[in-house]
Amino acid sequence: MSGTDKVRVNVSQTAQTPLHTSAKLPKVGVLLVNLGTPDGTSYGPMRRYLAEFLSDRRVIEWSRLIWYPILYGIVLNTRPRRSGRLYDRIWNHENNESPLRTYTRAQGEKLAKALSDQPNVVVDWAMRYGQPSIESITDRLLQQGCERIVIFPLYPQYSATTTATVNDKFFEALMKKRFMPAIRTVPSYEAEPVYIDALARSVEKHLATLSFKPEVILTSYHGIPKSYSDKGDPYRQQCLETTRLLRERLGLGEDEMRATFQSRFGPEEWLQPYTDETVKELAKNGVKSVAVLNPGFVADCLETVDEIGNEAAEEFLENGGENFSHIPCLNDSEEGMKVIETLVRRELLGWV
């Protein structure tokens, strides 16, 4: 046999030997993240939560030289007790936690069950402020062998004060790690058909349970300072787009469904119209029946259950209104879980 023949045989034998004897899909983590919650309603837990939340530069953009004396000298000495009393009105005393934590846990558990056909996917959940922290759950996903992670900030409309700060905190946690997994972030979904359809179905189901027909339905979103929007934050436009699409889906006119903004804090002008002023104005102008939903919240929390369900209702009724109803958030309902699962499965394409 010639030298050339020997080379040909060796190449042929090598070509038939696979580079990998087995193909094992890497584990993929899916991390759901919502805004956060205190661990309790007493002064200590409330102060810790508010300190973390209100120290975030994405949330309060003022100079630290101006803001910190106000925060630590005034706000954190007065607001924890007031906020604690409000949280106590909606607290899940059976589980000793806020509704937001209850619903976010349920969303994580139901998503894990829905994705059980993907054995290499690990689902978990965290809070931007409070517990469980993004860093602790990121550690847990990495310890379970996740080489790829989909992070899902649970905000339908993007804002630097919400979506961006979740991503900031996630990457900050990874900065401490030697190994950096591959990352995908779920974008805002303010106009996704599955989301608009879920909102429409939730409205229709709720209205069917009422003994009255609302003359006006308000879509109330958490506000942000107007200056943030002026600097380029797309939040306002995305909120208005969600309301426009929902209005069209339900066949309502502009006077029958209106977008408003709630939860303003501090002396700055925030996005308008304000929800509390709008319900008061509607009542004084002779509107007798109103319903309010919160499309920007994927789970009920203090801002929806208490601020809308109690405070806005009281404002409306005290000024001449007769019927008020708060439409619950999507929470872990079938419609809400369909939204989350659809968006997660899209981001998992090519990874599972």
Curated annotation (Swiss-Prot):
Its EC number is 4.98.1.1. It catalyses: heme b + 2 H(+) = protoporphyrin IX + Fe(2+). It is found in: Cytoplasm. The keyword rRNA processing does not apply. It is an enzyme of class 4 (lyase). The keyword RNA-binding does not apply. Its main location: cytoplasm. One of its GO terms (molecular function) is metal ion binding. Pathway: Porphyrin-containing compound metabolism; protoheme biosynthesis; protoheme from protoporphyrin-IX: step 1/1. One of its GO terms (biological process) is heme biosynthetic process. Keywords: Cytoplasm, Heme biosynthesis, Iron, Lyase, Metal-binding, Porphyrin biosynthesis. It holds the Pfam family Ferrochelatase. It comes from the Bacteria. InterPro entries: Ferrochelatase (IPR001015), Ferrochelatase_AS (IPR019772), Ferrochelatase_C (IPR033644), Ferrochelatase_N (IPR033659). One of its GO terms (cellular component) is cytoplasm. Fe cation binds at residues 222, 303. Belongs to the ferrochelatase family. PANTHER family: FERROCHELATASE, FERROCHELATASE, MITOCHONDRIAL. NCBIfam families: hemH. Catalyzes the ferrous insertion into protoporphyrin IX. This is Ferrochelatase. It comes from Brucella ovis (strain ATCC 25840 / 63/290 / NCTC 10512).
